[in-house]
Structure formats: structure tokens, C-alpha cells
A protein has these predicted regions:
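Flexible "cap/lid" loop of the alpha/beta hydrolase fold
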Residues: 151-199
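Catalytic histidine-centered segment of alpha/beta-hydrolase-like enzymes
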Residues: 291-311
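Short beta-strand/loop motif that positions the catalytic acidic residue
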Residues: 256, 262-264, 268
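Active-site loop/oxyanion-hole signature of alpha/beta-hydrolase fold enzymes
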Residues: 16, 20-45, 65-144, 159-160, ...
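Acidic beta-to-alpha connecting loop that harbors the catalytic carboxylate
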Residues: 266-269, 296-298
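Active-site glycine-rich loops that stabilize anionic/oxyanionic intermediates
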Residues: 51, 59-62, 147
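Conserved alpha/beta-hydrolase catalytic His-Asp/Glu region
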Residues: 177-183, 195-255
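Short alpha-helix in the alpha/beta-hydrolase fold that links the catalytic acid
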Residues: 258, 272-281
Length: 323
């Protein structure tokens, strides 16, 4: 499903579909369901010029609900920061579902998979996030991406850097997948779509003895199983193909001028601190880059340790408002 259009002048390619649109000039984009964790109504500022929202972008293979506990903690910590004067302005908290995740509809597959169809899929998704924020009356946001959500946050920076008031990268990477990992994504997408099943991604809910204390808990396992069972197989397939065909964005790190946060769990099997610290070090154009290591934490830091992640995000918001 697609709706609306947006003109992003940073891109030079062209195409004719939402999932294969490079220029985004008069391009139909995806309609994303947006969860509002915190709203701000400022009667004295109808144009929202002094208010900058924070946008929480979820990881794969779940939806915005992975942010529930973190958003609750973020709400409380924003209240405290406002009362103490550490924040000058209130902060709306939004968490849109990606294409085919949660309450956002998945595009209909009209033909067999072709890599060309997904060459600009990430751009279309990222532009849809930007359009959602602009439709709400905001020119900029603090973009927070976890895992696959980090690809979107970095792509927003690539497409429209002036829309980035701040950026947080959690449990993610800027580089493309290694060939074997890329092939695995495409294989999972094929099985999910062909067999109408979520089973190929259910391993995200299951723990090993190397995982964090939280991830090994029955509550975490059951919650993640429920979230995954709620997903649309065609949505999982689309997002896996989008990620498999995404561009390398390591070149974006030194171009980030806004305040930034990089968050990594010590037990993350794919984006541990030794992988993410160089990403923070590469952000040489930003005056504020905070690197947070979360102990006993795996790949879903915001779900496993919501308070610690929310605390890092409040620090980022303070840096944004005082930048």
C-alpha cells in the first residue's frame, strides 16, 4: 500500500514505483502506522518550531512494540529532565511500524523477486518516515534506529540530512551484509513468502547460554514469540529483501553533523561494542557523540535494558536542545 508523495532533492535516480523509486519526485510512498507514545500540544507554537520529536524505528522481525518499555522509561525521564531544566522543550515520541510490520500494510508481490525491484526499497521506506514527520508539522526529528531500524536512520541522513536533528544507532551496522548473510536473508524471505510462515525468523525469540539474562527469561521468549507470530509473512519477506539490497552507508558516518548516540550490548552477536565503537569514532563531524555500552545485553538493547537505553536517549535529547 502506498500513499502521498515527497520531493527529496538529494537523489538523482528515477523510477516508477514505491519500492523502486530513486528520485522520490512525485513518487508514491508507503503509509506507515504511527504509534504516539508521547504527544505535545503547544498552544503558543502552532508550527511546532520549538518542538523536535524523537522517532523510534524498530528492528527485525518485530514491530514498534519492542519500544514499549523503553518508551515508558523515556516518558518518565523526559518528565524529570523537564522539571529539572535539563530539557528546554517537551519531546513527542513516535514509533511508526515499517512496511508490512505491525499495523502497516505490506506491498503486494506482483511478480517473482528481482534485485532491481529492491534497489531503492530502503530509500522509499526512509522517505516514507520523513513524509510522516513532515505531515505532522515537523521539519526535523531525532532518529533512533535499532538493528534494521538503524539502516533507516542512516538512510534518512543520506537522503535529507537537514531533517536530522539528532541520531541514535542501536545494535546496528553501517556496512552491507557479507555474501553469506545476504544470501540467508533472501532465503528466509523466499520461505516466508512461499509458505506463508514466520517460522524462519522464530529463532530471534529463542536464547542460548551465550545470550543475556533477560533474553534467556521465559517472559522475554514468550513476548518475542507472540510479536513474531503477529507478523505478516509477506512483510517479513519485503523487509529482508530491502535489507539484503541496501547500499553501504559507512560513508555517511563522517557526514553526520547532528548530535549522535551509539548504543551497543556486550553480548550482541552481530553488532558488539568492538564493531560499533569504530562507527562512533567515524562520526568526526559531530560535536557530540556518546558511545554507550550496555552490560549483559544482546541485540535488542531497548527491550532487554529499556532504562539504560532511555537514559542514553535523554542525554542525546539534551545535546540536541543545547546544540
Amino acid at each position: 500500500m502506498s500513499e502521498g508523495s515527497i520531493n527529496l532533492n538529494n537523489s538523482n535516480n528515477s523510477s516508477d514505483s514505491a519500492a523502486n523509486c530513486g528520485s522520490f519526485k512525485d513518487c508514491s510512498l508507503f503509509k506507515l502506522h504511527n504509534t504516539v507514545y508521547r504527544d505535545v500540544k503547544n498552544a503558543d507554537d502552532s508550527n511546532n518550531s520549538s518542538v523536535t520529536p524523537i522517532v523510534l524505528i524498530h528492528g527485525f522481525p518485530v514491530d514498534h512494540r519492542m519500544w514499549d518499555a523503553c518508551a515508558d522509561s523515556l516518558n518518565s525521564q523526559i518528565d524529570a529532565a523537564l522539571s529539572e531544566g535539563a530539557l528546554k522543550h517537551d519531546v513527542p515520541i513516535f514509533a511508526p511500524d515499517m512496511v508490512g510490520a505491525g499495523l502497516s500494510e505490506a506491498p503486494k508481490a506482483e511478480r517473482e523477486f528481482s534485485e532491481a525491484d529492491y534497489a531503492h526499497a530502503l530509500d522509499a521506506l526512509s522517505a516514507s518516515y520523513i513524509k510522516l514527520i513532515k505531515d505532522l508539522g515537523y521539519e526535523r526529528a531525532v532518529w533512533v534506529g535499532l538493528s534494521m531500524g538503524g539502516y533507516v536512520a542512516l538512510d534518512v541522513q543520506r537522503l535529507l540530512p537537514q531533517a536530522v536533528a539528532g541520531i541514535a544507532l542501536c545494535d546496528t551496522r553501517a556496512c552491507v551484509d557479507a555474501p553469506q548473510a545476504r544470501a540467508k536473508r533472501l532465503e528466509i524471505a523466499e520461505v516466508c513468502e512461499r509458505d506463508r510462515t514466520v517460522e524462519p525468523v522464530m529463532h530471534f525469540a529463542h536464547a542460548t547460554e551465550k545470550d543475556s539474562t533477560v533474553k534467556q527469561s521465559p517472559e522475554f521468549i514468550q513476548t518475542f514469540e507472540n510479536w513474531i507470530n503477529d507478523q505478516k509473512p509477506e512483510g517479513l519477506a519485503w523487509r529482508q529483501r530491502m535489507a539484503a539490497c541496501r547500499p553501504d552507508m559507512e560513508d555517511q558516518l563522517p557526514l553526520i553533523t547532528a548530535p549522535a548516540a551509539v548504543i551497543s550490548g556486550t553480548l550482541d552477536p552481530s553488532s558488539a561494542p568492538e564493531i560499533m565503537r569504530p562507527m562512533a569514532d567515524a562520526m568526526t563531524s559531530s560535536k557530540h557523540v556518546d558511545f554507550t555500552v550496555v552490560e549483559d545485553c544482546g541485540h535488542f538493547s531497548a527491550t532487554e535494558h529499556p532504562y539504560e537505553v532511555a537514559n542514553a536517549l535523554v542525554t542525546l535529547l539534551q545535546n540536541v536542545q543545547h546544540n
